[in-house]
Amino acid sequence: MQELRIGVLDFTNVNPAISAGVQRLPGGRAGKPYNPNRRLQDAIKALGHKPVVYKVEKCQMFFDNRKAAILYNNKKVKGCDVLVPRLDFCQGIDLEISIIKQFQLMSIPVINKYLPIARAKNKLRTLQILTKMRIPVPKTIVIRRFEYLDDAVKKVGGYPIIIKSPFGTEGREVVIIESRRSLYSALDIIWRQSQSGIILIQEYVSEATGSDYRAFVVGDHVVAAMKRTAAVGDFRSNLSLGGDAVPVKLTAEEESLAVRATRVLGLDICGVDILRGNGGPVIMEMNANPGLEGISRVTGIDVAAEMIRYAALVAYKNSKK
């Protein structure tokens, strides 16, 4: 098998407030903080390929009347056979990921591509696509004004409810509300800070009891899965917020649902969060930039290596066109 040049598009420091630490998860390894970009590079080398790192802060997009190109440190970029972007921000999404589209315009295969990432980063757009394709999601209503709140709560089944920003990640900007008084107080603060003014009100799936299931999808397969349970006193099961996790075997229905949801969004790689409701599994979240450390540690499966194997396969197929 020939050696490939596999690119890693590193968004670290694009948003210093978020990139200010590649932090270790609770219960993670001692020593250096886990760096997913470094882990991908190590996986590329271990599989016999050459890593090519592009730090976004050093890239310049160039246009003329003939082609689109990328300069790196003001010099023409030597291309790669396939590119794997790693993002670490949730604001200014469309603008920041334009660099991914630029690589696509240079005929470089990208995993994941620009448009699917933009869809997945927007919870509202994700809900629209999943609903159109009849993929089950929690009851959700989108509002902008206080006067619609009471009816909105009734439509999703009453308290408790979940309120979300359209763009939060890792459980941030997600709040459980148990009363009308709490809802009005919380939204007064959230709307003052919100850039979009849009809030998602979602049913609380009580039978999930603070647990969800993360499926790590690569291509058409779930390569790893874990059950996450919220920390005491919280309802969010994200490992980054102190939740606990154990490896799990998903049901055939859940695996099929995760793969199908990934496919309809157009993603190659996705972290799919599933709730087990009384009516069957529902998709809670879709993450186009899923964390690598937690699920690898919990399951013992090297998901970074799985990603690179898939990227190499895409590159080989592309070279034969």
Where are the predicted features?
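Active-site nucleotide/adenylate-binding loops and adjacent lid/helix of ATP-dependent enzymes
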Residues: 6-25, 30-32, 37, 77-78, ...
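Anionic group-transfer/hydrolysis microenvironments
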Residues: 12, 88, 166, 204-205, ...
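A short beta-strand motif that forms the metal-chelation/ATP-contact edge
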Residues: 215-217, 280-294
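A long amphipathic alpha-helix within ATP-dependent nucleotide-binding catalytic cores
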Residues: 234-283, 305-320
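Short, flexible active-site recognition loops that position polar ligands and cofactors
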Residues: 292-302
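Protein kinase-like catalytic core scaffold
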Residues: 161, 223-224, 270, 282-284
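ATP-binding N-terminal substructure of ATP-dependent carboxylate-amine bond-forming enzymes
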Residues: 1-111
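Phosphate-binding site of ATP-dependent enzymes
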Residues: 175-265
